[in-house]
């Protein structure tokens, strides 16, 4: 394995750069978007306007770009890196690449917020790094780091990355080429997000996992690999990644810019890494789910203290302290950026107050920590620096929580609060709490949602018209869509991009064939993307612009979701819940049906179809059931996925009309991954 020399990236002032158009898209199924005769509107990607250039220049006045502390931290401990890193999947598409980000080796262009550009440059520093004696990280092989802690007979792995098929295996291969072979004695998965568990099958095989029926100490002594996770982990994995998996994956395209080209006018970084990996996800059920809020154990000679932090960045999450190394692993509770209290891909909102409290609790529990490291970005060293890092991070979440509630009690709505609130000046200037991933505006709305829900108490909003109907009514009242477009174009020339995007998107929802509205909306969104400091916001704006111009016709064909490795880890009850979600109630609402479900590898259930609603009862088989079917647990997923071959192979109708069973199978919905978002 060749080693490249560490490249110290210099982050300097903005340099005007020649702008090139985004990669030309393939033919799309969306309405063709052509230039407006009089307005000059067209479907091409645009350079930054002067308003955008000025907005990005103002960032230099806000932040101290001469402060290279984070750059030094990102480089510290570097040991080795490959000359090239470019992992390709089906049809030659990049699954993970650092090579494509070579364009970052210069000053920020007009089309990028210079603060986000710096973050992207630091995330382009990749390879093997030493955190402290005996603790190493492979960074930049995935959006998340894979951490290796040396034990007496091998390695403890902290988090696994996203992809078993691609990134995790490559990271392990690279690590072993530098550090030698060694058995993985334990895997600690810090929380229930796919970029932390999805690579596990690239590190270990299912047959290597310790006996789940054994206590943890016996698992660790067995010679097998223990998989240690926080309380509630398995339930959180399934509910978040399977129940709304289709919608979440579609929205993730916007958050992570998965379909955008790499480049100055495309995707840069999402703050916690360059981008997400969405292929080759694996899942192995944990062997030990922690119960105690704080507990200590010894893993192959390494003392570890676990601190559970539920409801923070994930419903199930935990920090880990290695007292002999004075090294504090903060999972994703600290990440070198302002994180999401609500993630744009969609998930349960997080508890800002609890998040801050668990960080300060970690400070109290582990006051001797001399290095803090985590699942994303780079460590921070030195006892005082560690304390300051934790304090500033906790203070940001606590401020957002407390100030939002103050304004709520003064009668303001979430949208109003988001436009009012601003971080204290000293916190605003801290590089590692900048808004690279989460933002102050959408985090405020998350706090509002947690305490007050969606309703702002204005009864006008109790039963609003759906967007297309509202848009058509509004356009009818306005009377002349052409005149609206003229005014919007004039406002675009004034740099009022948010308003232009809003009003033109209303025109699109009233008439998706309005080509000029699509073009102008895309142009406005593109400028908002160029100005965004949050990588997630930049991606969302640019993907929306892309789809308005091109549709989704050239996106890769979507496989049926919800039947992958993660879904197969569900227990029978959770699978039945998922069946109820996938079942199209309208097709069965006139039917009442009872089914004995005899599972060969789990408890039996009585299923009741009541006006199209699926209810189930454990260990309650009925002699009067309309159907009796037997199958292994995985057969439930054969039904939900509509896989006729597996249905025939796995499922036996023991009693009743097989045609009735087929009716049940035919009621399962087939989700379209590429459902519309920016248009009706």
Summary of predicted features, one role per range:
Residues 130, 155, 160-164, 222, 233-309, 354-366, ...:
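Metallo-beta-lactamase
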Residues 26-39, 490, 496-502, 506-509, ...:
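Feature captures hydrophobic
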Residues 18-21:
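C-terminal motif of bacterial Sec signal peptides marking the signal peptidase cleavage site
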Residues 471-503:
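Alpha-helical segment of the N-proximal tetratricopeptide repeat
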Residues 40-52, 337, 353-416, 420-455, ...:
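Divalent-metal (often Zn2+) His-rich catalytic cores of metallo-beta-lactamase-fold enzymes
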Residues 153-154, 165-228, 508:
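Active-site metal-binding motif and surrounding structural segment of the metallo-beta-lactamase
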Residues 121-182, 318-322, 326-332:
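Conserved beta-strand hairpin/beta-sheet module of binuclear metal-dependent hydrolase folds
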């Amino acid at each position: 394995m060749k080693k490249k020399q560490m490249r110290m990236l210099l982050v300097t002032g903005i340099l005007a750069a020649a702008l090139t158009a985004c990669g030309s898209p393939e033919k799309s199924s969306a309405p063709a978007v052509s230039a407006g005769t009089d307005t000059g509107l067209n479907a091409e990607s645009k350079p930054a306007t002067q308003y955008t250039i000025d907005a990005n220049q103002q960032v230099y006045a806000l932040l101290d770009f001469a402060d290279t502390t984070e750059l030094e931290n990102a480089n510290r401990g570097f040991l080795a890196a490959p000359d090239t890193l470019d992992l390709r999947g089906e049809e030659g598409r990049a699954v993970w690449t650092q090579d494509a980000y070579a364009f970052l080796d210069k000053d920020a262009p007009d089309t990028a917020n210079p603060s986000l550009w710096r973050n992207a440059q630091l995330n382009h520093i990749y390879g093997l790094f030493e955190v402290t004696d005996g603790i190493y990280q492979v960074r930049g092989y995935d959006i998340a780091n894979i951490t290796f802690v040396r034990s007496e007979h091998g390695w403890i792995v902290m988090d696994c990355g996203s992809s078993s098929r691609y990134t995790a295996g490559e990271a392990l291969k690279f690590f072993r080429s530098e550090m030698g072979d060694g058995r993985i004695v334990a895997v600690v998965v810090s929380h229930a997000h796919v970029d932390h568990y999805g690579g596990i099958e690239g590190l270990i095989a299912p047959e290597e996992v310790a006996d789940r029926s054994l206590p943890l100490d016996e698992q660790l002594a067995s010679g097998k690999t223990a998989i240690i996770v926080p309380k509630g982990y398995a339930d959180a994995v399934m509910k978040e990644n399977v129940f709304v998996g289709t919608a979440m994956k579609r929205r993730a395209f916007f958050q992570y810019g998965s379909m955008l080209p790499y480049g100055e006018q495309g995707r840069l970084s999402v703050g916690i890494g360059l981008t997400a990996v969405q292929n080759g996800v694996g899942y192995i059920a944990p062997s030990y789910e922690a119960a105690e809020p704080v507990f200590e154990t010894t893993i192959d000679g390494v003392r570890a203290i676990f601190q559970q932090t539920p409801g923070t960045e994930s419903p199930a999450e935990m920090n880990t302290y290695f007292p002999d190394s004075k090294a504090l692993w903060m999972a994703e509770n600290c990440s070198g950026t302002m994180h999401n209290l609500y993630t744009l891909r969609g998930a349960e909102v997080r508890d800002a107050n609890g998040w801050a409290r668990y960080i300060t609790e970690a400070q109290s529990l582990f006051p001797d920590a001399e290095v803090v490291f985590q699942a994303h970005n780079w460590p921070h060293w030195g006892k005082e620096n560690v304390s300051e890092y934790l304090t500033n991070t906790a203070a940001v979440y606590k401020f957002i929580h407390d100030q939002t509630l103050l304004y709520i009690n003064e009668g303001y709505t979430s949208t109003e609060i988001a436009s009012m609130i601003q971080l204290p000046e000293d916190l605003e200037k801290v590089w590692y709490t900048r808004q690279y991933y989460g933002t102050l505006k959408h985090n405020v709305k998350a706090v509002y949602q947690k305490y007050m829900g969606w309703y702002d108490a204005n009864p006008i909003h109790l039963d609003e018209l759906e967007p297309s109907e509202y848009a058509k009514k509004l356009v009818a009242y306005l009377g002349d869509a052409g005149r609206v477009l003229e005014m919007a174009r004039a406002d675009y020339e004034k740099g009022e991009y948010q308003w232009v995007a809003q009003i033109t998107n209303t025109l699109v929802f009233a008439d998706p064939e309005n080509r000029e509205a699509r073009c102008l909306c895309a142009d406005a969104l593109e400028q908002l993307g160029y100005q965004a400091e949050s990588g997630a916001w930049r991606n969302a704006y640019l993907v929306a612009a892309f789809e308005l111009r091109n549709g989704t016709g050239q996106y890769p064909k979507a496989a049926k979701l919800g039947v992958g490795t993660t879904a197969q880890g569900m227990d029978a009850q959770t699978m039945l819940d998922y069946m109820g979600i996938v079942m199209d109630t309208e097709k069965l609402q006139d039917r009442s049906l009872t089914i004995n479900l005899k599972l060969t590898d789990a408890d039996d259930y009585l299923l009741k179809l009541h006006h199209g609603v699926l209810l189930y009862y454990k260990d309650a088989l009925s002699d009067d059931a309309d159907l009796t079917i037997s199958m292994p647990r995985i057969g439930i997923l054969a039904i939900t996925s509509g896989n006729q071959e597996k249905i025939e192979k796995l499922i036996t109708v023991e009693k009743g009309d097989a045609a009735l069973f087929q009716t049940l199978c035919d009621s399962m919905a087939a989700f379209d991954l590429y459902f519309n978002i920016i248009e009706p």
